[in-house]
Each structure stands twice: as C-alpha cells, then as structure tokens.
C-alpha cells in the first residue's frame, strides 16, 4: 500500500510534492464529466515521469490483433480508447525560463480535489534555476452542467521576480499513445486556426474517421483587472494557441482563465464541429467563470443529494466511499445508451476503454438503487443494441439458431479480446447480463423493458447455453467443459460451479419471463416469437432438462461447493503463506505457478452465493466463505466488496469492515500496486453496495425490501438513500435504525424479519439487537 494522501471527508489532499508518485497522483486527481476526462497531470509541461492523458467518450481506434499463435475465432482487431488532444495545456514563461517542476525547486506544494464541488486545486511556491520565486494557484473544472466545457483558472504571483510573465494556453494535438504501441499515430489534424481571441484544433482518427474539434478562448487579468494583453498567436505543427503576458514586480499577479469546448462527431455533424465548438467556447467566455462554476457546483449538489453516504466516526471510510461515487459519476452520465463504462474510465488506457461484465455486476445495481433516474436502463439498452453483434460473435464460434455470446471486451459489440482462455472460455459473462435485466425489473417494478427488449436477450443467451453444455454419460448430467470462471487464476477447467449454477439461473429466468410476457404482454410476445423464430414448447423443454440435470460439483463432507473439477487436488493453503514481498502474485509469480496454486484471484463460488442469495441459507454461505476466503488474494478489484457483503451477512462484521476498506480505498491506498495505470472505475460502486447490501443487509425477498443492519465497531453511524419501486427511502443505522420514506407514497418493508409499512412523512425507529 501507499498511504501519502491526507484523510479528509470531502477532499483528496496531497500536501507535498511526490515526484516518485506522480503517475499515481495523476490517476487519483483525474477529472471528468461523462463526455470527456483527463488524468490529473500538470497543466504546464513536466519533463520527469508522467502519464499525460486526455480522453473523449465514444472515440475508439481499431488496432490489429497481435498474437503469437492465431486461433480461429480470434477477433481481427482490438479496439482502444485513444488519447485525445491535450486541451488543458498552459505554459508559464519568464524571461529565458519556463516552468517545469522537474527542474525547478518546489518550496511548497498542495494539491486538493474537492469532491463536493468537483473542483481540482493546486497551490505551490516555486523557485526557478535563476532564483526567481513565484506563487501559483490553479483551479481546474470539467463542467458537469455543460458537458462540453473545461475551465481552468491559472494564477501566478511574483514573490521576488521583476520582468515579464507570459501564460501560453495551447491546444496540443501532438499526442503520443502510452499503451503498448507508443509509436502508433492515431490522429490526423484536419485543420487548426485562430482569431484574436479564439483558437481551434480539428482532428480525425486515421482509421475510423471519427472527428473531434477543440476550441479555446481566454480571459487575462493583471492584479485582478482584465486586460487584452496583446496576444501573440501560436501556430505550430499540431498546436494552436496564444501567448499573453504582462510585466510584473514583486507582489503583482496575473491570471489566465481558459475556456475550452469539445465537440465530437458522436453528437454533431462533421461539417458543424468547428462552428459549434468555437461558438460554445465563446459563449462560455461571455457567461463568465463565476456563473459557470456555480452551475457546475449545483450539478454536483444534485448528485450528492441522491447518492451521498454519510459515515460518522471513520474519516478514512468516509473519504473512500465519496471518492468512489465521485469518480463513477465523473465517468458516466447515463444519458446516452451508446456509451458504457470502461474499467479505467478516463484515467488510463489499460483495457482499451472497453466494456466488461463489471458494468452489470457493479454499476447497474448501483444506479438502480442510488438514483431515481433511468441511468441503469441505458446501460441495459447498450447491451440490447449490441445483441445482433453478440449473435454474430457466437456464430463465429460455431453456435447457431440465434444463440448469443456477448463479448468479454468490446466498444462496439464485437469481441476484441485476444486471450483465448478469456475470449473463448470466460462465458459466464453472458449470465450477468441476464441477471442485470432481471434486477432492473425487480428493483423498479417496470416489466415493460423485459417485454420490449430484455426477453429477446434472454432467449438468445439461453440458446447459447443449450448448445454449449455437454451431456456426460458417466455422470448422467449436463456438464460445461473448457471454461474460465470469475477466478482468472484457473483457466480451461471443467464444471466451474459458478458458471454451471448461473447457467441454471439464466435458463430459469428466461422460462419465468417467457410465461409472464405471454400472459401480460401478448402483442410483445407475438413480436418476440416472430423475430426470434421461437418454438416455446420445444426450446423450453430443452432448457428445463438442462436445469434439472446440470452437474454442480460439491464436497458433501465439508458442506461446500467445489470451484471446479480438480480444484480439491491442489495444495490448499492460506494466503498468509505468501511472503509480503511476493504480493500481488500476478506481478511476481510465473503464470505456471499461479495456475498450479490454490490461490483465487477473485470471488468465484462466493460470487454465486452473493448474486443468488435467496437460494442459500446462512450456514451454507458461512461454510463456503470460511473455506474460500482464506485462499483469495483479491487481485481483482471486483473481489473485496463481494467478500465484504457476505462477511457482513454471516455476522463477521469486523472482517467485513476490513474487506470494505480494501474495496473502498483500493486506489487511494494502492492496494494492488497499479494505481499509476489508472483507477478501477467499474468496481467502485462495489463499496456502496458493501454498505447497502452488506452492512445494512438490504435484500429483496418475495418482492419485499428487507434490511438486517449491522455496524462496524469503529463507526458511530452510517446513512444512505435507496430507491425501490419508485420510492426513495432514507436509512440511518446507529444503536437504533431509522428509516423514512422521502419520495413515494407507501412501501412495505421488513427489518430483521418483522414487517412494517412506511408512509411518506413518517419515520420508523427500531433498536438494533444486542445494543
């Protein structure tokens, strides 16, 4: 772990300069608004170790697949989200000197990310090689209210310097990709230009013809008075901007406000990009900094009013949970079904910005429960819109009759992952998509989506499973061979329990909702039968046969489910036996050694017990938890929160708390020694779920919202809001549980198994057992 950031409930603070941790800090201080985002690199050039990266949502680049041994079914290309132009660049120049913290003395330094208001601040005092001392203050905003705008206020005060200070706002298209192909040239500059106060840079990806135009204007102040400053236009290869400045003496200050508008061909006609971005930049300047910042603050306040979690007595936990919520909303706005959430969001290029099954596991339930807005529905629509591609993906692997295999990794619906043990074998990903569809229905009460869209997906996935299973004559059971389960430290195994069990549940849900739609939505049912060529009697019989005869490996003596065939033949030992200097093992051990070990990357059997909790009693969960958790290294960000939830449910509250901190502060404390590459965005909602579904014990049982709260010893209280069936409940847990209905009319709930009816304006108070 790396603990160098200050603990504060609403702020992330780095109170001294850490050049050895610059890349990690750039990840931590990332900014975004769902349409674009940037790592938290310095606005001015920095010649030491740095990972500068800016990204625009929905912009992808197709890169040819490169593998040592080509296998039929491999995708021909890999999609990635490329670095975009650097729109935040501001150079600071003195006479014959230019600010570069790699070569200047940093006398004081404070960087602060205000999560409540969504503003990044940087304050520092620096001394140049020639002894010139300056005080610098920077405010940086990616506007949540106007999602095409970025705002930067860059202020410089002279401490002992007499002479000219020039500030140089630039749009920089001279970008080098930081992924595995640093020499890959992704962007063409179509045109750049400037007037006396506005510059633009019009760009296009080389292979997809996707276009982005950046436009920038500015205001310049000396001693808080605006001046025109006689700008010098800058036009270089792939760069455009201005140099503005003033003569200063000690005590004087200059300030530049940079207004940047970003427009992409995802939202605008190509022929209008320049005009639109220039107009929006100019409009921003006319509106002014103060008004734009206030709009931005209000937008964040609306988000926090819905989603904030308050933890009293534990500032580290409070900081962590707010940070995770903050970064998730910086990454995804939820207003465009063409977009999804990449594992790194706008904080890095790893994973190519692609969509994984993390979205359905963590993000969909978070948005379903935390906001009345239909954000989750757009994530489901993203998958529905890609159903034809999923059917095509399955066809490439030999499946037919409308069977669908959703990709492990995608930006456009086509598979673009080229590790065979993942692409071909981690097929459990299909089931979490069906699970998310059903969760949407269960938590919103809206069955229309299933009738119009969801059932079509469920049928296609169920057809895949009917063809993917094999019937074992010796076992007289259906088996699923050659798979990788959620634990990616086990490859090409047979009968992964989670895969087999989630297959059963997928088929059950399809059968259930087929009957529901047939009865309640006859027109939609007729449409689905027609477009899918469904033979319900014949196909349902096959699905039921698989459900009834699926092989599920178990150890009856231990009372546990076996992760997969052969797992129990391994040397079973605790992670305590791994030397600290060899963690994480994926950064120190050979792949052969990992595969032969018993160590589990992430929740596997336990993931099934979490998702399908209503089928398992507490003792079953306890036995499996106590067997598998000691062998789990949690080297996937998807793991700690699942274990935390289960630990809370079986009464291991302090263990749940330790795992919660792991999930909540995974990036802030760099548990896995990889925060420098970017944040773990799609697992961040897991920390929220660990509170709501773990400590608060929220479950839906027999269409009733149920709570069984516990509280970690360190906490005085915790509180949150949750949405269920168009109702919003506020829950506070301390020595007594307080539940009120803040939106809606009436809802039936259970607390510790006892039924209650909540009405608007009333509050339920219940003493916590044993307190």
Residues covered by each model-derived region:
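Acidic/polar, glycine-enriched structural segments that form the non-catalytic walls/loops
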Residues: 1-351, 589-593
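C-terminal capping/lid segments that line or modulate ligand- or cofactor-binding pockets
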Residues: 23-56, 60, 358, 362, ...
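Non-catalytic C-terminal accessory modules of carbohydrate-active enzymes
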Residues: 76-129, 134-135, 618, 622, ...
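Gly/Pro-rich turn-and-neighbor structural signature
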Residues: 305-339, 343, 500, 525-566
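Structural helix-adjacent loops and short alpha-helical linkers that scaffold large soluble proteins
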Residues: 311-318, 335-336, 369-380, 441-456, ...
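Helix-terminus loop motifs that line ligand-binding clefts
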Residues: 332-347, 373-435, 441, 448-452, ...
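The feature captures the catalytic groove of carbohydrate-active enzymes
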Residues: 347-355, 404-452, 460-545
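Active-site core of glycosidic bond-cleaving carbohydrate-active enzymes
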Residues: 355-361, 365-384, 508, 512-515, ...
């Amino acid at each position: 772990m790396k603990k160098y950031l200050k603990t504060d409930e609403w702020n992330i603070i780095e109170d001294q300069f850490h050049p050895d941790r610059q890349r990690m800090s750039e990840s931590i201080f990332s900014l975004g608004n769902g349409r674009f985002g940037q790592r938290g690199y310095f606005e001015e050039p920095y010649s030491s170790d740095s990972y500068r990266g800016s990204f625009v949502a929905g912009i992808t680049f197709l890169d040819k697949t490169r593998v040592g041994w080509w296998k039929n079914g491999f995708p021909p290309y890999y999609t990635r989200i490329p670095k975009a132009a650097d729109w935040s660049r501001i150079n600071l120049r003195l006479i014959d000197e230019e600010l570069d913290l790699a070569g200047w003395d940093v006398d004081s330094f404070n960087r602060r990310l205000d999560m409540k208001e969504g503003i990044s601040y940087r304050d520092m005092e620096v001394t140049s090689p020639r002894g010139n001392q300056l005080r610098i203050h920077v405010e940086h905003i990616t506007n949540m209210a106007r999602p095409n705008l970025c705002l930067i206020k860059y202020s410089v005060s002279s401490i002992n310097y007499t002479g000219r200070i020039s500030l140089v706002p630039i749009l920089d298209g001279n970008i080098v990709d930081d992924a595995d192909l640093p020499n890959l040239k992704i962007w063409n500059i179509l045109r750049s230009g400037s007037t006396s106060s506005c510059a633009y840079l019009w760009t296009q990806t080389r292979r997809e013809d996707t276009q982005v135009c950046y436009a920038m204007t500015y205001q310049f102040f000396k001693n808080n008075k605006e001046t025109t400053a006689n700008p010098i236009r800058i036009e270089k290869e792939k760069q455009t901007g201005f140099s503005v400045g003033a003569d200063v003496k000690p005590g004087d200050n200059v300030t530049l406000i940079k207004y940047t508008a970003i427009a992409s061909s995802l939202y605008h006609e190509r022929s209008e990009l320049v005009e639109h971005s220039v107009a929006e930049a100019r409009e921003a300047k006319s509106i002014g900094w103060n008004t734009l910042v206030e709009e931005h603050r209000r937008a964040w306040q609306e988000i926090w009013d819905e989603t904030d979690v308050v933890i009293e007595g534990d500032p580290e936990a409070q900081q962590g949970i707010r940070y995770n919520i903050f970064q998730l909303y910086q990454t995804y706005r939820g207003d465009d079904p063409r977009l999804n959430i990449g594992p790194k969001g706008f904080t890095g290029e790893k994973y190519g910005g692609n969509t994984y099954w993390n979205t359905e596991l963590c993000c969909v339930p978070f948005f379903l429960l935390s906001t009345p807005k239909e954000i989750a529905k757009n994530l489901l629509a993203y998958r529905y819109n890609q159903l034809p591609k999923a059917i095509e993906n399955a066809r490439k692997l030999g499946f037919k009759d409308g069977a669908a295999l959703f990709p492990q990794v995608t930006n456009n619906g086509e598979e673009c992952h080229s590790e065979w043990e993942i692409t071909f074998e981690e097929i459990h990903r299909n089931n979490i998509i069906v699970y998310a569809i059903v969760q949407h229905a269960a938590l919103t009460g809206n069955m229309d989506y299933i009738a119009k869209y969801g059932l079509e997906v469920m049928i296609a996935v169920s057809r895949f499973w009917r063809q993917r299973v094999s019937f074992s004559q010796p076992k007289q059971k259906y088996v699923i061979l050659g798979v990788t389960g959620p634990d990616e430290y086990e490859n090409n195994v047979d009968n992964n329990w989670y895969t087999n069990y989630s297959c059963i549940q997928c088929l059950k849900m399809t059968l259930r909702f087929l009957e529901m739609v047939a009865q309640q939505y006859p027109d939609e049912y007729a449409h689905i039968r027609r477009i899918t060529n469904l033979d319900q009697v014949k196909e349902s019989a096959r699905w039921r046969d698989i459900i009834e005869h699926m092989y599920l490996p178990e150890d009856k003596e231990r009372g546990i489910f076996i992760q997969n065939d052969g797992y129990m033949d391994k040397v079973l030992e605790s992670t305590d036996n791994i030397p600290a200097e060899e963690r994480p093992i994926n950064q120190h051990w050979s792949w052969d050694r990992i595969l032969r070990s018993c160590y589990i990357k992430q929740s596997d059997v336990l993931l099934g017990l979490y998702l399908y909790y209503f089928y398992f009693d507490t003792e079953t969960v306890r036995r499996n938890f106590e067997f598998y958790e000691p062998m789990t290294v949690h080297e996937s960000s998807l793991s700690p929160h699942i274990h935390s939830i289960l630990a809370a449910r079986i009464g291991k509250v302090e263990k749940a708390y330790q795992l919660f901190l792991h999930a909540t502060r995974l990036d802030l404390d760099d548990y896995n020694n990889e925060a420098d590459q970017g944040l773990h965005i799609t697992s961040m909602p897991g920390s929220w779920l660990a509170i709501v579904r773990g400590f608060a014990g929220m479950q839906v049982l027999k269409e009733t919202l149920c709570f069984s709260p516990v509280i970690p010893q360190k906490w005085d209280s915790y509180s949150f809001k949750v949405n269920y069936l168009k109702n919003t409940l506020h829950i506070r847990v301390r020595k007594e549980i307080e539940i009120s209905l803040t939106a809606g009319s009436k809802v039936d709930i259970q607390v510790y198994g006892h039924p209650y009816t909540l009405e608007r304006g009333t509050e339920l108070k219940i003493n916590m057992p044993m307190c």
